[in-house]
Amino acid sequence: MKYQQLENLESGWKWKYLVKKHREGELITRYIEASAAQEAVDVLLSLENEPVLVNNWIDKHMNPELVNRMKQTIRARRKRHFNAEHQHTRKKSIDLEFIVWQRLAGLAQRRGKTLSETIVQLIEDAENKEKYANKMSSLKQDLQALLGKE
């Protein structure tokens, strides 16, 4: 496993996930009967700061259809949590218009690079072009100054 599992932290994430799903109207319990489901949800709501009890609640009461989705959500959250610890692994997002993304993705594919690597390469190319243009302009001015003196 690449990322360490932190039981207390992840139990909090699981609790938040289940409460969010409940508030969105999803069935988070395995019970069909509304009163049994509400009773289980009420117990869950009282367990916010009880990580071990949250895991026990999940084992006893959670809707089996949510198991894989919750695992995926927690796995993604764990990855983001650990990546955020280091500047070089921290991720940022940008909004691109579809046509821009499409062109960037095509360029990245042709170059065999990731989108991030392609963006860095494009920035470096633009910086090099700018340096070259400045150097040429400076050489042109120096040459004109030399020719103008004679």
Swiss-Prot record:
<dbReference type="InterPro" id="IPR035375">
    <property type="entry name" value="MatP_C"/>
</dbReference>
<keyword id="KW-0238">DNA-binding</keyword>
<dbReference type="InterPro" id="IPR035087">
    <property type="entry name" value="MatP_N"/>
</dbReference>
<comment type="similarity">
    <text>Belongs to the MatP family.</text>
</comment>
<keyword id="KW-0132">Cell division</keyword>
<keyword id="KW-0963">Cytoplasm</keyword>
<comment type="function">
    <text>Required for spatial organization of the terminus region of the chromosome (Ter macrodomain) during the cell cycle. Prevents early segregation of duplicated Ter macrodomains during cell division. Binds specifically to matS, which is a 13 bp signature motif repeated within the Ter macrodomain.</text>
</comment>
<dbReference type="GO" id="GO:0006355">
    <property type="term" value="P:regulation of DNA-templated transcription"/>
</dbReference>
<keyword id="KW-0131">Cell cycle</keyword>
<dbReference type="Pfam" id="PF06303">
    <property type="entry name" value="MatP"/>
</dbReference>
<dbReference type="GO" id="GO:0051301">
    <property type="term" value="P:cell division"/>
</dbReference>
<comment type="subunit">
    <text>Homodimer.</text>
</comment>
<dbReference type="Pfam" id="PF17414">
    <property type="entry name" value="MatP_C"/>
</dbReference>
<dbReference type="GO" id="GO:0043565">
    <property type="term" value="F:sequence-specific DNA binding"/>
</dbReference>
<dbReference type="InterPro" id="IPR013321">
    <property type="entry name" value="Arc_rbn_hlx_hlx"/>
</dbReference>
<dbReference type="InterPro" id="IPR038339">
    <property type="entry name" value="MatP_N_sf"/>
</dbReference>
<dbReference type="InterPro" id="IPR009390">
    <property type="entry name" value="MatP"/>
</dbReference>
<dbReference type="GO" id="GO:0005737">
    <property type="term" value="C:cytoplasm"/>
</dbReference>
<protein>
    <recommendedName>
        <fullName>Macrodomain Ter protein</fullName>
    </recommendedName>
</protein>
